[in-house]
Every structure is written in structure tokens, then in C-alpha cells.
Regions:
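Acidic, surface-exposed loops and disordered segments
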Residues: 4-9, 18-199
Length: 199
């Protein structure tokens, strides 16, 4: 009887483990037990979106996350343009070579930097853009970084439709929304890229 009981206990434990594991796969979590790390590892570029608006509260949180990025000497040279105007989005999508997905998005955030305030604005703004992408991921949204800087033609397109002052330079356009398809994150960890004490 004891053997049967032990066997049943073991069977139940194994079933629970399999169920847990399959639940993690369904959610797409990496299972580190650390929510911040899981979110980083789960981030992926999403280029197709549902025709559904994103709540203002979520957009505000994305912007707040962007402004929480580190910046040299705490200058915070970033500026953000939130675009929801359909004509502007479609015009930029038509003119930017790698931003065609903007036609599907209901919104985009343009991350910009004030070149008059910081020579390294693009470094600080890159950190801000990454925070925005991670915030989107954490809230079940999909987003993708499409570069404007350092390409003069792309920067000019963004400048044209958003009326940026001369000293405000667009780093990237981030279209975002609720994902239309289920994307999987890429496994990017590569031990060969790690060096200790010297290359």
C-alpha cells in the first residue's frame, strides 16, 4: 500500500511539473523567477498589430519608462513625439524604407535628442528607446525600433512630418500596438562574445 501511495505521489509531482513547464511555455516566460530579467529575455520585435487603440495610461507608462533611462551627467537630452495622426503615420511609412509596418500601427513614439544640450544625445536616447521597448513588452504590447539617425534622408522625413526644431534630432521611430501574431523571442546569448580580463 505504501508503495502505491509513494508511486501516486511521485506521479502527481511529475504531472504538476509538466503542467508548470507547459504553462511557462504558453506564457513565453524564461522562468528565471526574476520579472525584470524575464521581460528583457522575452522582448522581441513586433511588426504586425491589431486594429485596436492602446490605452493612454499604457502610453504614459512607456514614456515614463523612457525618461527613467540613464544619461550622461543626468542631462536627459531626450524629447518624445507621440504620433497618432493617421495621415502622418502613413506618410512616414511610405517614405521610410524600413518602417512600412507603421501603416498598421495606431501610434508611434519618435525618440529624439537635443543636440544643443548633449554631444552624446544619441547614447542617452538609445537607452530611453530600449526602456520604451521593454515597457511595451511588459504590458503585452508589440513594438519595433526603426532607425532614423544617422541617415539624413530618414531624419528629414521624420522632421518634415513632425516639425522638429533644428536642434532636435530624431533617433528612431517606434510603432507599437497590440500584436496581431504571436512572435517568439530569439535566443541571443552567445558565450563566444564574452571575454574576461582581455579579449
Amino acid at each position: 500500500m505504501k508503495k502505491i501511495f509513494s508511486f501516486l505521489c511521485m506521479l502527481m509531482a511529475m504531472t504538476a511539473m509538466i503542467s508548470c513547464s507547459s504553462s511557462k511555455e504558453e506564457k513565453g516566460t524564461t522562468g528565471t523567477g526574476n520579472a525584470a530579467l524575464d521581460n528583457i529575455f522575452e522582448r522581441k520585435s513586433v511588426r504586425t498589430y491589431l486594429n485596436k487603440g492602446v490605452e493612454k495610461e499604457k502610453i504614459d507608462l512607456m514614456l515614463r519608462a523612457g525618461m527613467s533611462a540613464p544619461s550622461g551627467r543626468d542631462v536627459r537630452p531626450w524629447e518624445f513625439v507621440v504620433v497618432s495622426d493617421r495621415a502622418k503615420l502613413d506618410s512616414m511609412a511610405a517614405a521610410l524604407p524600413y518602417a512600412k509596418m507603421v501603416t498598421q500601427a495606431r501610434n508611434a513614439i519618435i525618440v529624439c535628442g537635443d543636440s544643443a544640450r548633449s554631444f552624446y544625445w544619441y547614447l542617452d536616447c538609445s537607452a530611453a528607446a530600449q526602456n520604451i521597448l521593454l515597457a511595451a513588452e511588459s504590458m503585452g504590447l508589440g513594438a519595433v525600433w526603426t532607425a532614423a539617425y544617422p541617415y539624413e534622408d530618414r531624419m528629414e522625413v521624420v522632421r518634415k512630418y513632425t516639425h522638429l526644431p533644428e536642434n532636435i534630432l530624431p533617433l528612431c521611430v517606434i510603432p507599437f500596438g497590440y500584436p496581431a501574431t504571436k512572435e517568439q523571442p530569439k535566443q541571443k546569448y552567445d558565450e563566444k562574445k564574452i571575454h574576461y580580463n582581455q579579449y
